[in-house]
């Protein structure tokens, strides 16, 4: 029997530069099939370029919460008029209508089979693009495994470093984060499964170098810094080793928001984010100035 190599690529978040290197690495490793498990766009402003690469590589593509997020804003399930959503509006407006229609039609999970091995692939979970599956929710993972008519449950979403384990003889795999990994500066994560004769023979957790300075320059050239520097700086903190500063920013923003208004979510939200995090514009600007020492733009 011939061994089939399947690449699982998750959480690109618009980082076309990282994706380009991942696809080169996959080709060098003789990958036969590609599965993209969501969060293709939205965070870095290279959505069209990212989606064109994805579409030309595979038809096995899922939506993540970031795609659902754009769809639901489009459907006016949230009010996105405050400052923290300016970059999201910019990235949505930059997408071609063809690519908007493409993400609208993406499924949130897939059941696939290679050489007799059944895979269930989702972004968050088989239930929702937003549901978290990680080590803290072991009971939930075990519940899905017990209900699973498949040999493997594969997902992303949490931006954990790549990991896998076997539960009741079934593979549970987090494919990591290809575009905005908080664990490795200038490295993209993805996974190659080698499948043969009804078995997963090998699980290769891949780390691929990409040029973070190219990402920085491409952000500058995109024009998004004229929209809202704060969020783009926070996003970049997440990939250049300053993730702690990013976490502290949002932790402090929540504290200040609660002190001043008593709530930190958007009332009346109708989408997947029932309690949508929302910070007043003055808090966003104030903390943006406070955290400038961590920013590169």
Residue spans for each PLM region:
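Core catalytic region of metal-dependent phosphoesterases/phosphodiesterases
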Residues: 4-102
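Active-site-proximal beta-strand elements of phosphoester/diester hydrolases
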Residues: 4-13, 118-125, 172-176, 204-205
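Active-site metal-binding loops of divalent metal-dependent hydrolases
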Residues: 10-12, 38-40, 65-68, 124, ...
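Anionic-ligand binding region
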Residues: 140-152, 156-166, 170-178, 188-190
């Amino acid at each position: 029997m011939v061994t089939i190599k399947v690449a699982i690529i998750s959480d690109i978040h618009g980082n076309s530069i990282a994706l380009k290197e991942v696809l080169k690495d996959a080709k060098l490793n003789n990958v036969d099939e590609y599965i993209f498990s969501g969060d293709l766009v939205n965070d870095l402003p290279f959505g069209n370029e990212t989606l064109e690469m994805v579409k030309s590589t595979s038809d096995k593509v899922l939506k993540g919460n970031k795609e659902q997020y754009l769809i639901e804003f489009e459907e006016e399930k949230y009010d996105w008029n405050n400052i923290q959503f300016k970059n999201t509006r910019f990235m949505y407006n930059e997408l071609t209508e063809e690519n908007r229609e493409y993400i609208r039609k993406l499924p949130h999970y897939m059941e696939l089979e290679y050489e007799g091995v059944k895979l269930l692939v989702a972004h968050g979970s088989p239930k929702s693009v937003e549901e978290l599956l990680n080590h803290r929710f072991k009971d939930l993972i075990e519940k899905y495994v017990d209900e699973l008519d498949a040999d493997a449950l594969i997902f992303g979403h949490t931006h954990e470093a790549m990991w896998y384990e076997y539960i009741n003889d079934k593979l549970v795999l987090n494919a990591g984060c290809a575009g905005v990994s908080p664990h490795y500066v200038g490295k993209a994560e993805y996974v190659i499964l080698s499948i043969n004769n009804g078995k997963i023979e090998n699980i290769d957790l891949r780390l691929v170098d990409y040029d973070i300075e190219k990402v920085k320059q491409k952000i500058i050239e995109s024009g998004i810094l004229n929209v809202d520097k704060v969020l783009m700086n926070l996003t970049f903190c997440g990939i250049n080793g300053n993730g702690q500063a990013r976490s502290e920013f949002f932790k402090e923003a929540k504290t200040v928001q609660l002190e001043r208004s008593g709530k930190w979510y958007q009332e009346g939200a109708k989408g997947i984010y029932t309690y949508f995090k929302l910070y007043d514009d003055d808090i966003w600007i104030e903390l943006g100035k406070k955290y400038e020492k961590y920013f590169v733009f």
